[in-house]
Amino acid sequence: MKRGKYHGSLAQALIDAAVVILDAVGIEGVTIRATARAASVSHAAPANHFPDRRALLTAIAVRCFEEMIAGANLAREKATTPAERIVALADAYVAYGLAYPNRYRMMWRMDMLDDSLAALSSIINGMYDSVGDDVAALPSVQRDTATTKLVALSSLIHGYVSMRIDGNFIAAADEATGKPRHIAMIEALIGATNHGGAAAHHPGNR
């Protein structure tokens, strides 16, 4: 492959190649050298875009957050209340994590990412601000408890996805409502159960 093939899109080509490696073997396999080899460029070629592995992993994380948030935003378009938007967002996050476990794990490895990078911090802060507005708008939430409720919600979603990925939980439905377990848990946390706050369609039990 000629070195000029990418015509300025080498960075994206490297990210594409790195994501393929990530999906196949996990974060341990994503190195500058392996990514360059997968992209059919010299080992030195990535240096202009990603000076080290942390920079490459951070760029991958930004890509993955963008993908996950895009899916969540699409799901939220059908929601009409804060509770419905929260459930739709959480459902989309769970679906993404279960579909792409290696990507999901890597996205939260702040010990391996550069969280001072504006692109990463901006997308994460925007994600929390968006759902935080919906949490604060819940009838059951007082303004001075909204942050605690947001942290609880984030912890519930992340913990559930992580335990599903690691095989600690299996796909199951709530015994009382018949809804996917994670939907029932989120509704219980935000006080949406029996208040019309649940999204009408939940594909699959998790």
Tell where the protein language model's regions lie, with residue ranges:
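Amphipathic C-terminal alpha-helical segment
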Residues: 154-172, 188-199
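Amphipathic alpha-helical linker/stalk segments
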Residues: 2, 62-86, 121-133, 137
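Helix-turn-helix
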Residues: 13, 17, 21-55, 59
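Short hydrophobic clusters on alpha-helical segments that form packing/core surfaces
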Residues: 14-22, 30, 64, 68, ...
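Amphipathic alpha-helical packing segments from all-alpha helical-bundle domains
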Residues: 114-140, 147-152, 176-191
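Hydrophobic alpha-helical connector segments
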Residues: 59, 73-102, 126, 149-153
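Amphipathic alpha-helical segments used for helix-helix packing
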Residues: 98-115, 162-170
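N-terminal intrinsically disordered/low-complexity leader segments
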Residues: 1-9, 20, 79, 194-206
